[in-house]
């Protein structure tokens, strides 16, 4: 009997130890049934600028639209020679070929193939000498193609011929600056570059800038270590200034000696003068990569760590599961069942590199069910897996029971992430019938995921007239063509039902936005659309209406004698100006007013809270009511199941039309149809404006100290000084594009003179001059009546043009290749 009891006791002990060991293993090491993604195979390509590597390029799996891919700018000196370094990793590079295209991609100017690549350490080196006659100060698209065993990988940069741009000096300075920040002793030398302003606020490492203190610039108490070094990427460069972006990774040890990972992005705007580099602007954002194994769980929420406060998140109706996106990764947390799941990530747990950790993609959470399943849309650059190197849109369904993210559909596109993001932020929604709705290339698409088919619901939608609800299940737009032109069309994407709102006779409608699921739109009369002397339109709304999909009016707002302008729609508040007409040309604001959202918050509302700690500074926390059951939930890693269906191919070629692209602070900021608004925006950013053919329309800080244009080369229609846009367009025909810069400052429009473009300037009711030159003290003005050129004081010129309304008209010559 004793032997039996002893044996039973031993078996019980073994069982208990085994159970405890298994539990310990699960909670401390987590269950790493990671994704089925293949490792990245595409090499990286970089430019070697005087022994400093710049402009790291990642491979695309298909040719891209040249005019919608501007990842970097590579300057050319008079030799037009470039050295490229290829990091092949584990791939065999069979050949290197390149082609130079006009930046709109319409014409190939040069193409060559190079088979003999020279091996230098871990890199392959290629020397290129461009033979084409390239125009100065004109961007061209350079496409590089690497022939691999896996196929062809494409790489893109813009090349531009500009003299004395000091590119290698700027790149070397950026590397010196960021490395010095990581060493407290070396960082002491950086103080002269900063413009610190004492605010008393807690350090926020996701928002460091040139006004931060030296201690904050040098990482305060975080004590980080460099994990993945950065390579400078030139975004803008000219004879005076340069803008450079640097991305790298850091690690830091928390109080428990556990490792935190941070993605860091820095922006530098610099000026080279008198053999020294001056820092004009500096911005740094550090964002923590979420790690479910760290101690981030509290009774009332979860700490996401150092990051910006604009969190993409969603909680299910039962308030049992919350999903959130951080640094390109999707996570879900279930406080009640003690689990945290990494639903989707391109990152490798170990032995990763920048190819898998690159965050040129984003995730839109569509739905979180009571069972914890998640529908989401992934869009942007695909770091690895079966779609490696594609820009595209993927629809996923995460099944929590299986712990698998199942790909339902994939749509490749040929525009870069910057442009794709502008469209997908407007609309990306999947209904419960497995239909995906997108805005792409100004078309509203419905994609049937089950049938792998697509249709266009509406063509030619203008972004300014399109609005969608917060969760994207409703949208509305102003119809711009056909029998329904001038109507507002609204759609419920869950039912696919639409309704029309028609204006009364003499009335006009404007879409404004959504409050909850209710449409906000404005009503005005034809005479409320005012046009000033320069042709700029302004709109005053008489009645603002909030209406549900069934047409029930929730709120109607009007103020007799006043017009609603400058409307801003937030989650809980509509803010606007009440304005009066100033003659028949403009509106003048009289006072502000608001409309509150009276809908009560749901019981499962999630709040974003900022907390602070001495080591990490400001951190972001998601606060909710669900109580956690453990301080150490089980961390799970979902597998990814790729679809075996064919890709859904849409026509994503963006229509040819006049557009002005504002680039600033390291990326695409906005797309404008009004060049004056584009210049005003670029001026605030310290950026540039390019047109559709990628000509420089305007650049901040690249104005020569003096310039004189020979009037002999100026078209007669311009010398006549007419500021009638239609007349100018007719006379210039195909030789140039008229650019209306009315509303800009004289200082801004003098850039056009610097670029040898004359500017027509209004001086009175029926008088004008043509600005043909300037120096430090004067403008040089051509009188169309006397046909004489004379100097006029700079301050007097500023005053003269301001009194006439700052009406400036110029033109940019058509490029003939």
Task: Tell where the protein language model's regions lie, with residue ranges.
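Core segments of small alpha/beta cavity-forming domains
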Residues: 40-99, 104-108, 139-222, 296-339, ...
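Beta-propeller fold detector
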Residues: 110-113, 282, 340-349, 405-413, ...
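Surface-exposed, charged secondary-structure patches
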Residues: 16-31, 67-83, 94-114, 119, ...
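Short loop/turn segments that connect beta-strands within beta-propeller blades
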Residues: 335-338, 399-401, 448-452, 492-496, ...
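Conserved active-site-adjacent core of cysteine acyl-enzyme catalytic domains
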Residues: 708-817
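N-terminal Sec-pathway targeting helices
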Residues: 1-16
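A short hydrophobic beta-strand element
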Residues: 140, 235-251, 372-378, 519-524, ...
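Exposed beta-sheet edge and beta->alpha loop/turn motif
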Residues: 241-279, 283
């Amino acid at each position: 009997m004793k032997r039996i009891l002893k044996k039973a006791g031993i078996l019980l002990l073994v069982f208990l130890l085994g159970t405890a060991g298994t539990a310990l293993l699960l909670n401390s090491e987590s269950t790493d049934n990671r994704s089925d993604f293949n490792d990245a195979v595409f090499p990286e390509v970089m430019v070697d600028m005087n022994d400093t590597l710049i402009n790291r390029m990642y491979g695309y799996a298909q040719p891209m639209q040249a005019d919608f891919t501007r990842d970097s700018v590579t300057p050319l000196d008079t030799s037009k020679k470039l050295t490229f370094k290829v990091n092949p990793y584990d791939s065999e590079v069979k050949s290197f070929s390149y082609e130079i295209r006009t930046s709109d991609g319409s014409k190939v100017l040069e193409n060559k193939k190079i088979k003999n690549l020279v091996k230098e350490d871990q890199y392959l080196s290629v020397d290129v000498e461009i033979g084409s006659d390239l125009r100065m100060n004109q961007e061209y698209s350079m496409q590089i193609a690497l022939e691999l065993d896996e196929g062809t990988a494409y790489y893109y940069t813009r090349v531009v011929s500009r003299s004395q741009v000091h590119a290698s000096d700027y790149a070397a300075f950026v590397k010196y600056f960021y490395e010095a920040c990581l060493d407290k002793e070396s960082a002491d030398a950086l103080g002269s570059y900063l413009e610190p302003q004492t605010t008393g606020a807690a350090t926020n490492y996701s928002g460091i800038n040139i006004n931060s203190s030296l201690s904050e610039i040098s990482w305060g108490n975080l004590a980080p270590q460099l994990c993945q070094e950065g390579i400078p990427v030139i975004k803008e460069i000219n004879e005076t200034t340069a803008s450079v972006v640097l991305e790298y990774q850091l690690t830091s040890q928390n109080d428990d000696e556990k490792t935190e990972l941070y993605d860091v992005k820095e922006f530098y705007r610099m000026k080279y003068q008198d053999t020294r580099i001056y820092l004009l602007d500096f911005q740094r954002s550090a964002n923590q990569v979420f790690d479910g194994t760290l101690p981030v769980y509290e009774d009332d929420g979860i700490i996401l760590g150092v990051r910006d406060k604009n969190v993409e998140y969603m909680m299910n109706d039962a308030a049992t599961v919350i999903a959130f996106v951080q640094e390109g990764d999707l996570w879900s947390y279930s406080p009640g069942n003690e689990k945290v799941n990494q639903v989707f990530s391109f990152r490798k747990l170990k032995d990763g590199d920048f190819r898998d950790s690159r965050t040129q993609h984003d995730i839109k959470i569509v739905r979180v069910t009571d069972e914890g399943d998640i529908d989401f849309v992934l869009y942007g650059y695909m770091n690895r897996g079966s779609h490696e190197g594609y820009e595209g849109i993927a629809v996923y369904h995460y099944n929590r029971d299986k712990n698998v993210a199942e790909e339902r559909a994939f749509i490749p596109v040929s525009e870069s992430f910057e442009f794709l993001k502008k469209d997908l932020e407007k609309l990306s929604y999947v209904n419960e019938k497995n239909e995906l709705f997108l805005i792409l290339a100004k078309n509203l698409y419905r994609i049937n995921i089950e049938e792998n088919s697509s249709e266009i619901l509406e063509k030619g939608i203008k972004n300014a007239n399109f609005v969608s609800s917060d969760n994207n299940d409703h949208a509305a737009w102003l119809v711009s063509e056909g029998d329904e032109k001038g109507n507002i069309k609204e759609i419920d994407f869950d039912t696919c039902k639409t309704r029309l709102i028609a204006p009364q006779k003499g009335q006009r409608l404007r879409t404004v936005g959504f409050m909850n699921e209710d449409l906000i739109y404005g009503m005005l009369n034809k005479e409320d659309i005012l046009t000033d002397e320069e042709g700029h339109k302004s709109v005053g709304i008489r009645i603002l209406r909030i209406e549900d999909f069934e047409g029930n009016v929730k709120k109607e707002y009007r103020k007799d004698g006043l017009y609603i302008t400058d409307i801003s729609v937030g989650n809980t508040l509509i803010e606007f100006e009440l304005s009066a007409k100033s003659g028949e040309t403009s509106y003048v604001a009289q006072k502000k007013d608001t409309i509150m959202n009276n809908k009560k918050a749901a019981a499962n509302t999630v709040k974003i809270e900022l907390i602070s700690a001495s080591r990490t500074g400001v951190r972001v926390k998601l606060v909710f009511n669900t109580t956690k059951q453990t301080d150490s939930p089980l961390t799970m890693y979902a597998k990814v199941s790729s679809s075996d269906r064919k890709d859904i191919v849409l026509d994503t070629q963006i229509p040819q039309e006049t557009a002005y692209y504002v680039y600033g602070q390291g990326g695409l900021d906005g797309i404008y149809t009004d060049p004056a608004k584009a210049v005003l925006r670029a001026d605030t950013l310290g950026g540039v404006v390019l047109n559709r053919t990628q000509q420089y329309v305007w650049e901040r800080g690249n104005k020569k100290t003096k310039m004189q244009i020979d009037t002999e080369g100026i078209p007669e229609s311009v010398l006549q000084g007419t500021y009638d846009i239609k007349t100018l367009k007719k006379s210039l025909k195909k030789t140039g594009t008229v650019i209306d810069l009315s509303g800009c400052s004289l200082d801004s429009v003098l850039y056009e003179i610097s670029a040898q473009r004359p500017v027509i300037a209004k001086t009175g009711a029926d008088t004008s001059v043509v600005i043909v030159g300037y120096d430090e003290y004067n403008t040089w003005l051509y009188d169309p009546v006397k046909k004489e050129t004379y100097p006029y004081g700079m301050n007097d010129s500023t005053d003269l043009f301001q009194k006439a309304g700052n009406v400036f008209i110029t033109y940019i010559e058509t490029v003939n290749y």
